[in-house]
C-alpha cells in the first residue's frame, strides 16, 4: 500500500491488477490526451494555412482612412461601420491633389516593400465556402428579371399563340359579353310579354265594350260595373 502511494510513475498493468475501475479511468485519460493533441496539431495546421495568405498592399485611400476611421469612430461611437465608410469616401473625394499626394507616396513605398518581400505575388481572392453561398440570399439580378417577366407576362406572345394570361382575359371578356347578351335578351322578352299583356287587356276591354249591348239584352239586371276594367 505504501509503495503504490509513493510511486509517481506506474504502468497500466499494475493499475489493472490493483483496481480495474482505476484502469478504465486511466485509459480514458490516455485517449482524451491523444485526441486533445490531435486537435492542437490540426489547429496549428489551420493557423499555418491561414498565415500563408498574403494581403494586398494598401492603396492611398486605405493609408489615409486607417487613421481617419479611428477618429470618426471615437467621435461617433454609435455610428455603424457602413456609415463611417460612406463618410470617409465623401471626405476623400473632397480632398485636393496636394492633400492626397503624401498618401500616394506612402502607398508607392509600401508597394515597393511588398514586391521585395513577395517577388512572385499574384492577387488571388479567397473563394467563398459552400456554406456561405447557401446562407446568401438569391441574386438580386435574377429576382429583378423574374419580377420583370411576371409584370410583362400578359403581353408576351410565343410562336403566334397568346399566353395563358391573355387567354384567361379573353375568356373572361367572352363570358361577360355572353352574360350581357343574355341579360338583354331576357329584358327584351320581359318587355315584350308586358307589352303583349297590356295589348291583350286593351283588346279584351274593347271587345267587351263593343259586345255590351248584347250582354245587356241577355241579362237585363246586369250592371255595367261588372264589365269595368
Swiss-Prot record:
GO terms for biological process: cell differentiation; male sex determination; sex differentiation. It is found in: Nucleus speckle; Cytoplasm; Nucleus. One of its GO terms (molecular function) is DNA-binding transcription activator activity, RNA polymerase II-specific. Residues 54-122 bind DNA. The keyword Transcription applies. The keyword Transcription applies. Pfam families: HMG_box. GO terms for cellular component: cytoplasm; nuclear speck; nucleus. Gene3D superfamilies: High mobility group box domain (1.10.30.10). InterPro entries: HMG_box_dom, HMG_box_dom_sf, SRY, SRY-related_HMG-box_TF-like. It comes from the Eukaryota. Acetylation of Lys-130 contributes to its nuclear localization and enhances its interaction with KPNB1. Deacetylated by HDAC3. Interacts with CALM, EP300, HDAC3, KPNB1, ZNF208 isoform KRAB-O, PARP1, SLC9A3R2 and WT1. The interaction with EP300 modulates its DNA-binding activity. The interaction with KPNB1 is sensitive to dissociation by Ran in the GTP-bound form. Interaction with PARP1 impaired its DNA-binding activity. Transcriptional regulator that controls a genetic switch in male development. It is necessary and sufficient for initiating male sex determination by directing the development of supporting cell precursors (pre-Sertoli cells) as Sertoli rather than granulosa cells. Involved in different aspects of gene regulation including promoter activation or repression. Binds to the DNA consensus sequence 5'-[AT]AACAA[AT]-3'. SRY HMG box recognizes DNA by partial intercalation in the minor groove and promotes DNA bending. Also involved in pre-mRNA splicing. Belongs to the SRY family. This is Sex-determining region Y protein. It comes from Axis porcinus. The gene is SRY.
